[in-house]
Amino acid sequence: MMLEHVLVLSAYLFSVGLYGLITSRNMVRALMCLELILNAVNINFVTFSDFFDSRQLKGAIFSIFVIAIAAAEAAIGLAIVSSIYRNRKSIRINQSNLLNK
């Protein structure tokens, strides 16, 4: 696969994730869009690592670290969303201003 094809795929994933993050009113959907953005970044890390120096695995190793951090971020984010839903009975972003109460 050529470099341009992978970069176009990554840019498409990033732009879909960014659009979803900006327009989403649901917290779970916003977390999913954030994961799309992080996966697009991981694709770029692996692609550039393979394209510029295929003998070293720096991009793949860094991508594994980003995946681990993204998994922790998703777990913490879903725990926060679950807690907000338990208290407010809503997971809409515009209804969860926690500074009011």
From Swiss-Prot:
Role, per record: NDH shuttles electrons from NAD(P)H:plastoquinone, via FMN and iron-sulfur (Fe-S) centers, to quinones in the photosynthetic chain and possibly in a chloroplast respiratory chain. The immediate electron acceptor for the enzyme in this species is believed to be plastoquinone. Couples the redox reaction to proton translocation, and thus conserves the redox energy in a proton gradient.
Ranges annotated as spanning the membrane: 2-22, 32-52, 61-81
Membrane topology: Multi-pass membrane protein
EC number: 7.1.1.-
Protein name in UniProt: NAD(P)H-quinone oxidoreductase subunit 4L, chloroplastic
Cited InterPro entries: NADH_UbQ_OxRdtase_chain4L/K, NUOK/Mnh_C1-like
Catalytic activity: a plastoquinone + NADH + (n+1) H(+)(in) = a plastoquinol + NAD(+) + n H(+)(out); a plastoquinone + NADPH + (n+1) H(+)(in) = a plastoquinol + NADP(+) + n H(+)(out)
Family: Belongs to the complex I subunit 4L family.
Keywords, sorted A to Z: Chloroplast, Membrane, NAD, NADP, Plastid, Plastoquinone, Quinone, Thylakoid, Translocase, Transmembrane, Transmembrane helix, Transport
GO terms of biological process kind: ATP synthesis coupled electron transport; photosynthesis, light reaction
Chief location category: plastid
Source organism of the structure: Panax ginseng
GO MF annotation list: oxidoreductase activity, acting on NAD(P)H, quinone or similar compound as acceptor; quinone binding
Assembly description: NDH is composed of at least 16 different subunits, 5 of which are encoded in the nucleus.
GO cellular component, one term: chloroplast thylakoid membrane
Subcellular locations according to the entry: Plastid, Chloroplast thylakoid membrane
